[in-house]
Amino acid sequence: MPQRDALEVDVLFVGGGPASLAGAIRLQQLAKAASTELAVMVIEKGGEIGNHGFSGAVVDPKALHELFPGEEIAGGLDTPVTSDAMWFLTNGGKIKAPFVPPVLNNHGKYVASLSNLTKWLAAKAEEAGVDVFPAFPGQELLWDASTGSAQARVVGVRIGDKGVARDGSHKSNYEPGPDLTAKVVVLGEGPRGTLTKTAIARLGLDAGRDPQVYAVGIKELWKVPGRLAAGSVIHTLGAPLWNTFGGGWIYAMSDDVIDIGLVTGLDYADPTTDPHDNFQRYKLHPAIRPLLEGGEMIRYGAKAIPEGGLHAMPRFYADGLCIVGDSAGFLNGLRLKGIHLAMKSGMMAAEAIFDALQAEDTSSAKLAAYEQKFQDSWARTELHAARNFHQGFGSGIWGGLINAQLSLMTGGRGFGIKDKLAGEYGHERMKKLSELTPTQVTKRVVPDGKLTFDKVSDVFKSGTMHDESQPAHLHVSDTNICAERCTVEYGNPCQYFCPAAVYEPHFTKTGSAPAEGKLQINFANCVHCKTCDIMDPYQIITWVPPQGGEGPVYTGM
């Protein structure tokens, strides 16, 4: 076994997103007010803070104002919203809504880059005395199981090794990752976090909760002078997503940069659904194309989004553990916002943790104060009002829109009647090829390299880099299932749902004879969206962090 360095801190935040950074800052604010000192650390798998920061984003500054009362926050935000519009896209045109629903009114909000916001928050965290370490991927949780596995306590995180060859051997530059121990570990890894997934499964934190369901957001930044005024916000429904949950956005980050994207729900029925292709068709729509034509696409990215709502949130505390942000499902699908909720979750966790440290008791019973703070907060009020939003779309786009309207009128009740609509795992809604009708098969876009692009070209614009001599960080537990069953039953949907051309199935299956061929995994293309871990119908794909500092570089995203 390699000799590992060890470092002990009071509180360790995993993930350099808005939830972790806000939580770390709040913790140091409380320590300063109490004239005490805390060792607080934030680790991030990206090469720099902000490299993996990806969102729409229109930011509600509510949590920022709470975190920095009376301070200037413009450094973390870019452009005030100047106008709002809602378009319903038909196949050949658009219908502009006569008004924007109050829940989507963005007056006082900001069009912003999450990458830039997290860089600004990281600088504020370091000013407050937080140690921020990028290129430190949390590879596995450290446990103290001395009281029995059912009550195992999280005591730290092991950082991923560097210099491991593809066959698992150690290269000349091998460097074992250190063990970081802490009185409390806070998981803010984003959606479908690797350590969060492990903790939820081992500790049963999702017991009695609805399944979490996700969508994938795909977006590009375009340099297009003079098409939209800075601060313009447009949201769209309808084409091309007639049979799938989702919608689009167009945000003017400045007078010459447009942020455009499309969300596709990861609970679709057709296994040949391709979210990246959906986005290409979106850009070809007659209402969208004129906004981009003649411009230059300058950045690309993709990320999963937790859409399950209040009833799908796991218990977000345990012995020595808190879960924050997207990892805990703090996102309002109805408002299309989550950054302010992520920050608030980190701040509430920090307040509960500080009290626990002062009492020298970081047990689950003490950290349950985080749950109570949430129950008493505006975050819970907001999420309660949107608790049935995504579930309503299980009956189609029109059912979803009717449910959304009735929910708004009845405090969030499903279709105005039910307090709680049932949820289900997205991958379980996928149908087999034999259940599809020919009319459901969609013709793919042939990319022109100007307005529409293939996946590999888009990946280049994400800045993604991985050392190809390391082991693949996408683990398929049984490729025989891919060859013998998935080829026939689902047509290997990994080749479609991945927005980065990571998976290339090369299988031939004839009758009862064993399948021939292999699954090629182009892990160097991976943009860390987690779609494969979420949507694989057999749940045999596990995403784990690659070597520290690798992955996309979401500058300005």
Give a label for each model feature.
Residues 36, 120, 124-290, 348:
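Predominantly flavin-linked oxidoreductase catalytic cores and closely associated redox partners
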Residues 19, 48, 192:
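Conserved Rossmann-like nucleotide-cofactor binding loop
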Residues 393-450:
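C-terminal auxiliary extensions adjacent to catalytic cores
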Residues 37, 45-92:
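N-terminal FAD cofactor-binding segment of flavoenzymes
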Residues 329-335, 347, 351-397, 515, ...:
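Active-site-proximal substrate-binding core of FAD-dependent oxidoreductases
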Residues 488-524, 531-552:
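Iron-sulfur cluster-binding cysteine motifs and their immediate structural context
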Residues 303-333, 458-469, 482-497, 504:
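FAD-binding beta-loop-beta segment adjacent to the flavin cofactor pocket
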Residues 11-41:
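N-terminal Rossmann-like FAD-binding beta1-loop-alpha1 element of flavoenzymes
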